[in-house]
């Protein structure tokens, strides 16, 4: 439990969604640069206190660590206990499932033994390299991680983020059916990063048919990146804000910090806020900010919240 000084910094208020339908949050609460940005008061240092403080600021958050590693269920169980009723946590799917490379060193104990000899000493493995036994174990572990959040009613969507190089194809659609089968009963959200998907409206028809959530993205307007396409394929709508740093995204080999270093203006966010009001309907709208550098995702999320609440942000263009 926090001491008295810490407790004073950890109010019990839970902000809740705007109008009960529009949730605004960030794509992490523990990313290193975000922790250093000043979002957390000086006395809030322990991981559990940071999460509790976060819940006094926003009603929802994404778990980004589940993309990089298969986390133990003890983590999600603890997070479910540390967050208030009504708080929503979304989990990013393990990167291996979507075709990204996965670190062998970060695999759970015993998992490396399921790999062929030639892969056990590798730094990374990919979906196409691993045997079925290994993949099944990964799915079992990931499902077990999600269960504590689902059982407490705090699990939101499970985000499947496709790599930038993946274009529209029947094989990509078939992979989504596998995800749906492996995580039956969970809400799945799919994010495209390659512009080719925008040229195939049948992809949205497929998502709607399979009750998969289409994730809208706010990215720089560059030839290879997915544009902002307004669409809703489920009663939940999701938009993820990655920033509009053209130089960072256009630069080959740019670091994460270089790409996501962007501070939105109220005018840039206003059209999305208006869209949130239209799309929420009887479902839910999630506005998730991923521009973590210098804490911009939190400050921008707050601006967005004032816009959807109908309160004009000071200093914005009328």
Residue ranges of predicted features:
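Residues lining hydrophobic/aromatic ligand-binding pockets adjacent to catalytic sites
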Residues: 1-318
């Amino acid at each position: 439990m926090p001491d008295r000084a810490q407790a004073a910094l950890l109010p019990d208020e839970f902000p809740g969604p705007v109008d009960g339908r529009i949730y605004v949050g960030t794509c992490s609460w523990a990313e290193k640069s975000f922790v250093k940005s000043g979002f957390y008061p000086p006395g809030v240092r322990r991981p559990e206190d940071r999460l509790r403080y976060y819940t006094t600021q926003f009603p929802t958050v994404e778990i980004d660590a589940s993309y990089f590693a298969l986390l133990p269920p003890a983590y999600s169980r603890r997070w479910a206990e540390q967050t208030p009723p009504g708080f929503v946590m979304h989990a990013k799917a393990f990167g291996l499932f979507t075709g990204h490379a996965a670190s062998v060193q970060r695999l759970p104990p015993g998992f490396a033994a399921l790999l062929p000899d030639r892969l056990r000493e590798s730094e990374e493995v990919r979906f196409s390299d691993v045997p079925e036994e290994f993949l099944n174990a990964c799915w079992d572990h990931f499902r077990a991680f999600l269960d504590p959040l689902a059982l407490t009613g705090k699990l939101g969507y499970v985000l499947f983020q496709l790599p930038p190089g993946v274009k529209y194809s029947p094989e990509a659609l078939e992979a989504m059916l596998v995800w749906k089968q492996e995580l039956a009963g969970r809400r799945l959200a799919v994010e495209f990063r390659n512009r080719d998907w925008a040229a195939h409206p049948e992809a949205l028809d497929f998502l709607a048919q399979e009750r998969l959530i289409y994730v809208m993205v706010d990215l720089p307007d560059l030839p290879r990146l997915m544009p902002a396409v307004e669409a809703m394929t489920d009663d939940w709508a999701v938009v993820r804000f990655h920033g509009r740093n053209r130089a960072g995204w256009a630069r080959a080999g740019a670091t994460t910090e270089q790409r996501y270093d962007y501070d939105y203006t109220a005018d840039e966010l206003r059209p999305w806020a208006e869209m949130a009001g239209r799309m929420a309907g009887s479902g839910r709208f999630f506005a998730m900010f991923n521009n973590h550098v210098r804490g911009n995702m939190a400050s921008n999320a707050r601006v967005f919240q004032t816009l959807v609440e109908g309160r004009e942000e000071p200093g914005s263009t009328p």
